[in-house]
Amino acid sequence: MSTVFNTNPVDVLNEPMFFGSGLGLARYDIQRHRVFEELIERQISFFWRPEEVNLMMDAAQFNKLPQYQQNIFTNNLKYQSLLDSIQGRAPSAVLMSLISDPSLDTWVATWTFSETIHSRSYTHIMRNLYTDPSKVFDEIVLDEAIMKRAESIGRYYDDVLVKTREWENAKDMVEYYKDQGLILADKDVEQRAKRDLMKSLYLCLHVINALEAIRFYVSFACTFNFHKNMEIMEGNAKIMKFIARDEQLHLKGTQYIIRQLQSGTDGDEWVKIAQECEQEAVDIFMEVNRQEKDWAVHLFKDGDVPGLNTNSMWSFIDYLTVSRMKQCGLPCPITDAPVKHPYPWIREYLNSDNVQSAPQEVELSSYLVAQIDNDVDDKVMMSFKKYF
């Protein structure tokens, strides 16, 4: 992992996801983790551009909304802009130097690129809704309610960067002492630095997972509600549907990584780290739960919108938290979460397979590209001979 291209032969089927031999040839014919290849193919098939969605009607409808409802939409847009500003660079900048599985390496690059499309989407929306979109962007870093969430995410990414430097420094020091024929007093310095980094990485993965699993969904609910229950702003709902579809892939990826580490696929040390960090991982999720509830209060401080209110949004957040924590192997202290989905109608926006539309009536958001199976064997060819 100290070189951009490992020239030594590597058995990719036996490489761990992190801290392995270092990446060499980018190859996609074999994978230790088929899930990552499936996510890559799916994400590529989802490729879209926000400019493809016309927002002229949305702009006219937005301008007719009461000011407090405009504020709800704008604040959510600001918050999502911040989240995807982080996710548009942090996974690549922080995780990729530690990755040793080729398919995971490509998945993180693909995932991060898709987040930049999300960021561009917010610019597309703002250009269409506001006379001065730059003013809206400039206000984001001045919003305390938004920025405290950035700090709670960024500090875990930053800690991985710090721990990575400390591990690299420890390796260099051990190598220097060895080359000089000197005896290093602290013989465990490198291993200790690596384990500290592993713990930091494990917790950072939970922060990423919580971000993808919960943080976007208050904003999603509000945006989809404008279309579903208020019957306005269809274009924005379609863009957010594209984004939500991508985020579910990203969530599946982080959940898979976490569960593999917890199960010991990459070694028993990860199992021990998962056990040691379980309470801190639970605390991470519960902090996200509290912050999103605070965000709901902030959004609806001047009034509710048809179909949504603070109480139902809190129930939605609890419902998501219990489900998402279970999916990543964590116990959840919430005991009074609703059993039934508080917003069952949102599923039609989160699952693109649920909605069927006539192509001549609406712009399809469920159209996939690059979905042809090119694997044709001799048996398939023989079956076609009867037609010739």
Swiss-Prot record:
Swiss-Prot/TrEMBL cofactor(s): Fe cation
Transmembrane intervals: none
PANTHER family the record matches: RIBONUCLEOSIDE-DIPHOSPHATE REDUCTASE SMALL CHAIN, RIBONUCLEOSIDE-DIPHOSPHATE REDUCTASE SUBUNIT M2
Function: Provides the precursors necessary for DNA synthesis. Catalyzes the biosynthesis of deoxyribonucleotides from the corresponding ribonucleotides.
A single GO BP: deoxyribonucleotide biosynthetic process
Cofactor info, note text: Binds 2 iron ions per subunit.
Keyword Metal-binding: yes
Protein family: Belongs to the ribonucleoside diphosphate reductase small chain family.
An annotated Gene Ontology molecular function: metal ion binding
InterPro entries: Ferritin-like_SF (IPR009078), RNR-like (IPR012348), RNR_small (IPR033909), RNR_small_AS (IPR030475), RNR_small_fam (IPR000358)
Domain of life assignment: Viruses
Positions with a binding annotation for Fe cation 1: D84, E115, H118
Assigned keywords, A-Z: Deoxyribonucleotide synthesis, Iron, Metal-binding, Oxidoreductase
Subunit note: Heterodimer of a large and a small subunit.
The EC number(s) this enzyme carries: 1.17.4.1
Positions contributing to Fe cation 2 binding: E115, E212, E247, H250
Gene field: NRDB
Reactions it catalyzes: a 2'-deoxyribonucleoside 5'-diphosphate + [thioredoxin]-disulfide + H2O = a ribonucleoside 5'-diphosphate + [thioredoxin]-dithiol
PROSITE patterns (alphabetical): RIBORED_SMALL
Leading EC class: oxidoreductase
UniProt-recorded name of the protein: Ribonucleoside-diphosphate reductase subunit beta
Active site: Y122
